[in-house]
Amino acid sequence: MSDYNRTTRECSVSQLHAELRQAIQNYFTEHRLGSLEAETLMCCETISEKKSINKLVSWLNGKSDATIYTGMLLTSEWLIWVHHGDQSGTRLNAANLKLIHAEFYNSRIPKDAGLQISGFPVGAKEGIRGQIGMGPEMATQKCCEEVIKAIAKANPPSTQKHIFGLPFGGPGKT
């Protein structure tokens, strides 16, 4: 089981938790990405609430966030996701859609759903692979599908087979 109970909803940027909205607005302003509302294709928010655990486990693991807010924003070129935890503070990640791959995941053990991302977010020195945990609501699947479609549109898969940089079959053959 996941350590958190999660709920996800599709929303407008103005409906995001205040810390999430402010972090995204600051990122848009700092990187001159245009008007936040005009550029947004899709936005969703997940609230993750820590499940009850016994005091010994809590003591061994140290203080962890009781509540985590996660916002995910999609534009035609960017995927931006930001977390705000009551202990960990605010952390924003952004990736150009041409530099990432995403898949919907829905696991039964632990019971969890969300978006699995691999690629190169802004500032990463090497590729990453991680997950954005989301709730069981239909909004999760819709948001994930929109991200996956946007990535495919920004970076369509090659239909031609290549071996060592040459078309399959050697030079001059396709």
Which residue ranges define each predicted feature?
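Phosphoinositide-binding peripheral membrane targeting modules
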Residues: 56-114
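Short amphipathic beta-strand/extended segments with alternating polar/hydrophobic composition
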Residues: 92-97, 126-136
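Terminal and domain-flanking low-complexity segments
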Residues: 18, 135-174
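Acidic/proline-rich low-complexity IDRs
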Residues: 32, 127, 133, 163-165
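Anionic N-terminal interaction surfaces
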Residues: 1-72
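Short, surface-exposed polybasic-and-hydrophobic patches located at secondary-structure transitions
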Residues: 111-131
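Generic structural motif
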Residues: 100, 120-122, 135-137
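Hydrophobic, Leu/Ile/Phe/Ala-enriched alpha-helical segments that form helix-helix packing faces
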Residues: 24, 28-32, 117-119, 147, ...
